[in-house]
Each structure stands twice: as C-alpha cells, then as structure tokens.
Amino acid sequence: MAQIKITLTKSPIGRIPSQRKTVVALGLGKLNSSVIKEDNPAVRGMITAVSHLVTVEEVK
C-alpha cells in the first residue's frame, strides 16, 4: 500500500478542539514535524479535517 508524508505547516493554536486532537492523533507535535502513514481512508479523512494546517506528499 502507498505511504504518505504529512507535515504540520501551521499551528493548531486557536483552532477548534477537534482539529487540535486530529493533529495529535496524526502524530504531529511541533511545527514542521513530519510523519509517514499508510494511505487509507481513515488517514485521508483526518487529513481532510486539518488540510489547512498540513501539507501532504506521496512517499515512494
């Protein structure tokens, strides 16, 4: 299965609590931190919820 790299590019400070919890659930802490996750519908849904805070790129 494909993998994706998710990078936190904007701060979740001042966002609604559900968005802050989604950022933590993705494994992102500080700005510019990155994680590599499997590309599946659950992760894609989380990315959609915080798409204004993260950048996503495909890992080969």
UniProtKB/Swiss-Prot annotation:
GO terms for molecular function: structural constituent of ribosome. Gene3D superfamilies: Ribosomal protein L30, ferredoxin-like fold domain. Keywords: Ribonucleoprotein, Ribosomal protein. The keyword Nucleotidyltransferase does not apply. GO terms for cellular component: cytosolic large ribosomal subunit. GO terms for biological process: translation. The keyword Ribosomal protein applies. PROSITE patterns: RIBOSOMAL_L30. Belongs to the universal ribosomal protein uL30 family. HAMAP family: Ribosomal_uL30_B (MF_01371_B). Part of the 50S ribosomal subunit. This is Large ribosomal subunit protein uL30. It comes from Streptococcus sanguinis (strain SK36). The lineage of its organism: Bacteria, Bacillati, Bacillota, Bacilli, Lactobacillales. The gene is rpmD.
